[in-house]
Amino acid sequence: SLILCAAMPAIPAAAAETADEEAPARLGPAAYWGTVTWMDEDTFLLDSGKEDGLGDAVVVHVGDAPYLDAVTGNTLNLETLEDGDAVYAWVGPAMALSLPPQSTASLIVGNIPADYAVPQYYEITSSTVTEESAVLHVAGSNDTITVPASAKLTPYLTKNIVTLADLRPGARILVWSDSKGTPEKVLVFAYGYRGYISVAEDG
């Protein structure tokens, strides 16, 4: 894998919050969108056709990346992804310095309806969990995401029960939000993270 994740040592809550405020956000997977042109059975060119905030074109190595339906979150068969189809792909953060750049996918989302608000993919770096919500810091951003207790949490490919307490550092999540930007559905991917920071309600 091109992504190297180091375990974070447990430190006091106040110190963790100060570090989050002062330190630049750790790089996370980068989002690209566009249409697909297959190069071989495991690699495609993803080209948005224009310069924008998500970049222009990137060569995506699929590897073991899940391919999911943008609306339902259900797994799709990668063999159904054809040239000309539009997808979002989260890659990296490591990029090969080539033209176009190359990277390995973490997640691919397809079957995107027109004008649909595509769910967003994050890696959690720290969490503050209460009975009412989970406030998350995520890689690649200094902003926080607040997941309310009312949000529907679902595990990826398992029948385990997941709760707000499972939104811990190291977890990767796919988040669908309502028109106000409040998360209403969260798909939680399996992880095996140790030495994480979790700030409890009582400190």
Regions found by a protein language model. Give the residues of each.
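Short, structured beta-strand/loop micro-motifs enriched in basic residues and often containing a Trp
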Residues: 63-73, 150-159
